[in-house]
């Protein structure tokens, strides 16, 4: 699977929420179908995301690149430490959850 292609497709056709605060909020409420976190995200943020995602039974995929690379992959001019997939749209991004 081409991660960049599927992420952009989810961004265009589905609902993707960027940012750690919103991602943690969605992890707490169970409002996401998949959470993606950058490898270099701050430890406190990663710990919170993994903890709440586990409680809500939401799969978490750790992006192998940095938050700068994740932001660039999404076509954003800023860093993205984490994001939540609320609706995958026409993408197959949820296949990452099975890895």
Swiss-Prot record:
InterPro entries: Ribosomal_eL30, Ribosomal_eL30-like, Ribosomal_eL30-like_sf, Ribosomal_eL30_CS, Ribosomal_eL8/eL30/eS12/Gad45
SUPFAM superfamilies with a match to the protein in the record: L30e-like (SSF55315)
GO MF annotations, alphabetized: RNA binding; structural constituent of ribosome
GO CC field: cytosolic large ribosomal subunit
Alphabetical keyword list: Ribonucleoprotein, Ribosomal protein
PROSITE patterns, sorted: RIBOSOMAL_L30E_1, RIBOSOMAL_L30E_2
Origin superkingdom: Archaea
Biological process terms in GO annotation: translation
Family: Belongs to the eukaryotic ribosomal protein eL30 family.
Listed name of the protein: Large ribosomal subunit protein eL30
Origin species: Pyrococcus abyssi (strain GE5 / Orsay)
